[in-house]
Regions:
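Extracytoplasmic/periplasmic solute-binding protein
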Residues: 76-80, 85, 111-164, 210
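Beta->alpha turn/N-cap motifs
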Residues: 35-40, 198, 215-220, 239
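A local structural motif
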Residues: 3-12, 98-102, 181-196, 209, ...
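Hinge/lid segment of periplasmic solute-binding proteins
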Residues: 37-89, 145-147, 235-237, 245-247
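Short, solvent-exposed loop/beta-turn-alpha elements that line the ligand-binding surface or hinge
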Residues: 53-65, 103-105, 129, 133-136, ...
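Extracytoplasmic/periplasmic substrate-recognition and gating elements
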Residues: 2, 95-97, 187, 226-257
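Glycine-centered hinge/linker elements that transmit conformational signals in sensory
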Residues: 114-115, 160-195
Length: 257
């Protein structure tokens, strides 16, 4: 309710949010607002989080499905931005290669299209997937987002509703399916993946050097603005990994908290 209050905004460099937050919270003037994007962050920083239960903003929320809670059940982080991730597609490049996004409905059809583009990369002037770099600014796409795929299907089958102590790994082969495709049907393979960055992967799609790029809706402004991509050429498909019935799958969706 008070206006005119000076606010200092600290922006962490790419891939350094966790270390930056830890350093800021250790200061006498710790942050008033900060992000806890997953349960791991709640475990690390929950003691600094003021519970939202009983506040006006909680009364305004239509669902608490995306909120994060502490061990005592208190709501410690709430969703403020709804977003989705999957495989971003340059439809114009697909068409140039003689394919259509409509023919991709599962892992088998995705692999067929990607294999064909990769085999003709020199002729086409672009490859199938942008680099799946393992440098810190890129690796979170796979250690976090991609890892959701086998976990989602396992938890769905087993009726898991809370963090389990162990996993069965029932769908780890499916994780391997899509990871192998990312790292095979790409111009960046092998040892080069260790140092390939997130910016490089983004630029490969943005500059028309790759047809597929795993990331999320937050990439729209960079791709349409920085790289001047035609919005009509952009689409996103689910991350297919060879699970039965995935033809009916949608995008992975959630919130920043």
């Amino acid at each position: 309710e008070q206006t005119g209050v000076p606010v200092k905004v600290v922006t962490a460099a790419s891939g350094t949010y966790d270390t930056t937050l830890a350093a800021e919270l250790d200061k006498s003037s710790a942050p008033t607002l900060f992000q806890c994007g997953n349960q791991g962050a709640i475990n690390s920083y929950g003691d600094y989080c003021y519970p939202f239960d009983g506040t006006a903003i909680m009364d305004q929320m239509t669902t608490d499905a995306f909120n994060l809670k502490g061990e005592d059940g208190q709501t410690l982080a709430i969703g403020y931005c709804y977003e989705a991730f999957g495989i971003i597609v340059n439809k114009a490049l697909l068409e140039k290669a003689g394919h259509s996004i409509d023919e991709i409905t599962n892992f088998e059809s995705l692999k067929a299209v990607a294999d064909d583009i990769h085999a003709r990369a020199d002729e086409l002037g672009f490859d199938a997937f942008s680099s799946a770099g393992l440098e810190g600014s890129s690796s979170w796409r796979f250690s976090g987002h991609l890892a959701n795929m086998p976990l989602y299907y396992e938890f769905r089958d087993d009726g898991v509703t809370a963090q389990p102590a162990t996993i069965t790994g029932a769908y780890l082969e499916n994780f391997k399916n899509i990871w192998d495709l990312y790292t095979t049907d790409s111009a960046t393979t092998g040892a080069a993946l260790a140092t390939a960055t997130g910016d490089e992967s983004e630029a490969e799609l943005g500059e028309g050097k790759a047809a597929f790029y795993q990331n999320g809706t937050w990439e729209y402004s960079n791709l349409s603005g920085t790289f001047n991509m035609n919005p009509d050429d952009l689409a996103m498909i689910p991350i297919y990994c060879g699970v039965e019935g995935e033809e009916k799958a949608g995008l992975c969706a959630g919130t920043e908290n």
